[in-house]
């Protein structure tokens, strides 16, 4: 299985744009051209047809990111192009629709989509990048291949602080406590993946951003994630088995009755990166 990750979205692009400090967390693949948004002269840039940009450049509140002038620089591109935005926790919000006023932008494929537009296509955060311990895709594939029996019902363990966590995770955590779910121990990555694989369902609220690695870890292991309804989860629930929760205070275990047994995994092949890219016609 060619597991989806942020690096892979970057690597299929012909050119990548970010700030120098972003590169530590991005792909180390040197096959494509990397451009420093603060140093490169974008005037009449003879751009390729597929461009990656670090999605933190969308940020409208941090002075250092605003000063980079991301949108103004995209306006200088000479040729039509599709834009892939990934590799940060920042979301694509209603305000970012002004990007579609740039004549040369055809489609935007973005992580953490928080609005809708006919030319805006959500793409998965997938699993973590290879620089992280929890981005060991070879090990994750080995657990997938082992097909560990699902003997437990709902996995319950996550951090509450940081990013989107502070808004939604306390409500999800309170639901887990109210339902008397056994809270799993925090484990090292490899032990965690093997433990997670034993479950049919998993409480999976938002992460640092709107999307979350946990949801995708679940889907790869054929666990049905239980997620708060938002633009991202609602979109991917059309492709994969995901339980959408509108109100954590109203969620109950009986909502899961028959769900795992009737889960439709017919699109599981789309969890392969190459298949997903073909599905999107990138």
Predicted regions and their residues:
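Nucleotide-sugar donor-binding catalytic core of glycosyltransferases
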Residues: 1-216, 220, 224-243, 255-282
């Amino acid at each position: 299985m060619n597991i989806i990750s942020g690096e892979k979205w970057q690597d299929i692009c012909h050119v990548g744009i970010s700030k120098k400090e972003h590169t530590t967390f991005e792909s180390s693949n040197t096959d494509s051209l990397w451009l420093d948004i603060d140093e490169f002269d974008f005037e009449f840039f003879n751009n390729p047809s597929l461009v990656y940009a670090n999605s933190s450049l969308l940020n409208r509140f941090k002075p250092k990111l605003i000063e980079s002038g991301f949108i103004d620089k995209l306006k200088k591109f000479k040729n039509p192009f599709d834009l892939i935005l990934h590799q940060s926790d920042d979301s694509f919000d209603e305000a970012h629709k002004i990007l579609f006023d740039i004549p040369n932008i055809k489609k935007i494929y973005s992580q953490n989509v928080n609005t809708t537009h006919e030319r805006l296509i959500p793409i998965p955060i997938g699993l973590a990048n290879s620089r992280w311990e929890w981005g060991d895709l070879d090990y994750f594939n080995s657990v997938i291949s082992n097909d560990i029996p699902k003997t437990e019902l709902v996995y319950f363990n996550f951090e509450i602080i940081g990013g989107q966590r502070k808004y939604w995770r306390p409500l999800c955590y309170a639901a887990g406590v109210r339902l008397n779910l056994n809270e799993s121990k925090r484990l090292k990555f490899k032990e965690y993946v093997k433990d997670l694989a034993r479950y049919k369902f998993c409480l999976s609220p938002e992460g640092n951003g709107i999307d979350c690695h946990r949801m995708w870890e679940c889907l790869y292991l054929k666990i049905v994630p239980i997620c708060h309804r938002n633009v991202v989860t609602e979109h991917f629930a059309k492709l994969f088995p995901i339980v959408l929760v509108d109100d954590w205070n109203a969620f109950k275990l009986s909502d899961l009755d028959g769900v795992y047994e009737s889960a439709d995994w017919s699109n599981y092949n789309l969890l392969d990166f190459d298949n997903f890219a073909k599905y999107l016609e990138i």
